């Protein structure tokens, strides 16, 4: 195919107007097996594409690659009725006669490279996937639910939604907490304003580069205190960007790591334990149990599980200690008394040993975390941990870009605080319920 194959007489003006993609023209065709055959508008123009390697205009068509795509056409202004269209796009690949070795595809804007959906269909799929499963949304639109395409579909829409957000208003207190999702750790960056906890973002990994890329967008002069999980790369990043801030490890972090260790023991040694909701009831203070009738069942279950009994007793000691005015010496004593059989707690002992200076710094802080801080962090961690299986981009999109951010206006400029922790937890659980219950997506 080249300029000899089609002329302007081959253009179907009515179908081109009906399709409504500015850069494409529809060709007259008698083929019923391919939907609409389309080429780029520049196919009929004298424009010479520049070589991306040497910027020369001495380029010519080298070959044609046919791309099959699905497109979405809305049939009403309310975007409730639609039609899915098959497109066969004849995409030209150009060769540069100047540098001789460069072969490149003609650039397009209506669809991403490698994606089998046009951007307007891709955007509709992404908007639905923020709230429902990708498979359910694809079923609604009648297109294949390829897992290979979900990342490309979501990343484009995430970039768009992110571009609409106002800049972050830098809080005086920042917290960086690693949340666990499908066995991987992702730093959640939290801000504290007027006693409320807000989520600013969830980062792809805990590396210094990733964490630093976000932190440098904040105003270092405004940050006074940073609560950081005991992870070396996170500490290196915050020390680099906020050298004047007080950087500490909180009692909440110690309790969270101890709780995670306790959960590992419950899952390995507590199979068929005679208590409903054992993960929650075996990780809270004995005196705070919401149902006292489970106390005899806990005692009964522990009789045949000596390692779980040891872990439970030692974890209870830590929880009781944290309710008092504890000291570093108290924590070290608890760590020294970790039973040899319960090596899951050794990681908590390492935190107390290695990050003792940062824990001591927390004790001397004039301003402690708000009363709801531990509850807010645990709620976020639990909600994300229980989200249905998906890739990171989908998880982050559902958490950060499908929930309303709190904003404020100052000197005529709009700023955002982030997402209030209670709203974040509620919406994540709602989205997870949508997916688990396989609720219908659409307008039925």
Regions found by a protein language model. Give the residues of each.
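Short, conserved DNA-binding cores of transcription-related domains
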Residues: 1-101, 105-107
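Inter-helix linker motif
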Residues: 244-263
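Short, positively charged, Gly/Tyr-enriched micro-motifs
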Residues: 72-185, 221-223
């Amino acid at each position: 195919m080249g300029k000899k194959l089609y002329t302007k007489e081959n253009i179907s003006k009515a179908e081109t107007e009906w399709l409504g993609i500015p850069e494409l023209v529809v060709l007259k065709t008698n083929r019923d097996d391919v939907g609409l055959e389309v080429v780029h508008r520049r196919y009929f123009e004298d424009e010479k594409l520049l070589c991306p390697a040497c910027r020369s205009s001495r380029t010519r068509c080298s070959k044609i690659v046919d791309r099959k795509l699905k497109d979405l056409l809305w049939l009403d202004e309310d975007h409730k009725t639609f039609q899915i269209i098959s497109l066969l796009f004849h995409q030209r690949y150009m060769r540069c006669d100047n540098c001789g070795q460069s072969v490149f595809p003609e650039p397009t804007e209506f669809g991403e490279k490698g994606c089998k959906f046009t951007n307007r269909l891709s955007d509709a799929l992404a908007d639905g996937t923020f709230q429902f499963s990708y498979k359910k949304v694809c079923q609604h639109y009648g297109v294949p639910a390829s897992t290979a395409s979900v990342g490309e579909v979501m990343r484009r829409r995430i970039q768009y939604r992110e571009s609409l957000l106002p800049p972050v208003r830098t809080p005086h207190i920042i917290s960086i907490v690693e949340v666990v999702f499908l066995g991987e750790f992702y730093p959640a960056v939290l801000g504290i304003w007027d006693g409320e906890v807000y989520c600013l973002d969830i980062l792809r990994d805990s590396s210094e580069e990733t964490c630093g890329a976000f932190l440098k967008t904040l105003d270092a002069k405004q940050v006074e205190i940073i609560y950081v999980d005991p992870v070396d790369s996170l500490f290196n990043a915050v020390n680099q960007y906020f050298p004047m801030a007080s950087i500490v490890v909180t009692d909440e972090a110690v309790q969270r790591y101890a709780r995670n260790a306790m959960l590992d023991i419950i899952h390995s040694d507590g199979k068929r334990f005679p208590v409903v909701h054992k993960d929650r009831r075996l990780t809270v203070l004995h005196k705070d149990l919401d149902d006292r009738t489970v106390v005899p069942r806990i005692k009964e279950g522990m009789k045949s599980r000596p390692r779980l009994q040891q872990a439970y007793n030692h974890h209870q000691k830590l929880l009781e200690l944290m309710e008092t005015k504890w000291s570093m010496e108290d924590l070290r004593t608890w760590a020294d008394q970790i039973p040899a059989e319960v090596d899951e707690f050794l990681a908590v002992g390492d935190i107390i040993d290695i990050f003792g200076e940062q824990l001591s710094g927390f004790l001397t802080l004039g301003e402690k975390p708000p009363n709801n801080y531990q509850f807010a962090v645990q709620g976020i961690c639990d909600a994300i941990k229980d989200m249905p299986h998906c890739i990171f981009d989908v998880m982050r999109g559902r958490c950060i870009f499908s929930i309303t951010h709190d904003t404020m206006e100052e000197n005529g400029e709009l700023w955002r605080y982030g997402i209030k922790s209670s709203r974040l937890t509620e919406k994540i659980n709602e989205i997870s319920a949508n997916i688990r219950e396989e609720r219908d997506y659409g307008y039925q």
